[in-house]
Regions:
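Alpha-helical promoter-recognition and RNA polymerase-docking modules of transcription initiation factors
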Residues: 1-84
Length: 84
């Protein structure tokens, strides 16, 4: 299996299979973060959708030359998207 950084770089260049693999890899993380923000009476699906938008933003905003992992960057982007 490819390294997540390699997948991100491919996705940034328009590789749909790479993006699909990233989404599948990070779906559990998006769901876990989304559940932290879920309130009774609210829509968990809506929160998860916002989290996925955050994941997409992370993919296109990630710069591997910075000294942080994609996973950490993605978590921040997911949380920020859900909070806004």
């Amino acid at each position: 299996m490819e390294d997540v950084t390699e997948l991100v770089l491919k996705a940034q260049k328009g590789d749909e299979i790479a993006m699909e693999n990233i989404v599948n890899m990070f779906r559990p993380k998006v769901s876990a973060i989304s559940r932290e923000y879920f309130l009774v009476g609210g829509g968990l699906d809506d929160i998860i959708q916002e989290g996925m938008i955050g994941l997409f933003k992370a993919v296109y905003g990630y710069k591997p030359d910075k000294n942080h992992s994609f996973s950490a960057f993605a978590s921040l982007c997911i949380e920020h998207q859900i909070q806004t």
